[in-house]
Amino acid sequence: MASMISSSAVTTVSRASTVQSAAVAPFGGLKSMTGFPVKKVNTDITSITSNGGRVKCMQVWPPIGKKKFETLSYLPPLTRDQLLKEVEYLLRKGWVPCLEFELEKGFVYREHNKSPGYYDGRYWTMWKLPMFGTTDASQVLKELDEVVAAYPQAFVRIIGFDNVRQVQCISFIAHTPESY
């Protein structure tokens, strides 16, 4: 009976050793015997961009004589209908419209340091109060007309404020002075 137990134990051990050798490769030292896959790197810039050959057609914003203000500042001045659509968009998003104006400089400028600081041109004067509860975009444009009538030489921007997250979500120039 003792010989029977020992022979079955040896058989079990020999089976486990064959399974182990098939599952794990033998240790060959610290240097790997197989090489890493090598991929050819393409340094052509047109293959990296998603628009291919149109990279050559892109233009640069002219920095002389044209200031970059807010969102959409790279576009020509918005027409009345375009302003109406932008205000309708911010109302659809549930944002509160607000009007702000600046009499001197409608852009970020350097006053207190060599680099623009926290207060350098970022804060404008608010026109009245935020328009909580406004559902009609034409009401916002009427307020815009009032600002322009009161301060024709001012920069005026429309802001969409999210009162739940308490952040400004959109801001764009609605009026620039004729002299600018």
UniProtKB/Swiss-Prot annotation:
Pfam families associated with the record: RbcS, RuBisCO_small
Alphabetic keyword roster: Calvin cycle, Carbon dioxide fixation, Chloroplast, Photorespiration, Photosynthesis, Plastid, Transit peptide
Single Gene Ontology MF annotation: ribulose-bisphosphate carboxylase activity
Subcellular location: Plastid, Chloroplast
Superkingdom of source: Eukaryota
Location of the transit peptide in the chain: 1-56
Oligomeric form and interacting partners: Heterohexadecamer of 8 large and 8 small subunits.
Protein family: Belongs to the RuBisCO small chain family.
Protein name from the UniProt record: Ribulose bisphosphate carboxylase small subunit, chloroplastic 3
Native organism: Pisum sativum (Garden pea)
The gene coding this protein: RBCS.3A
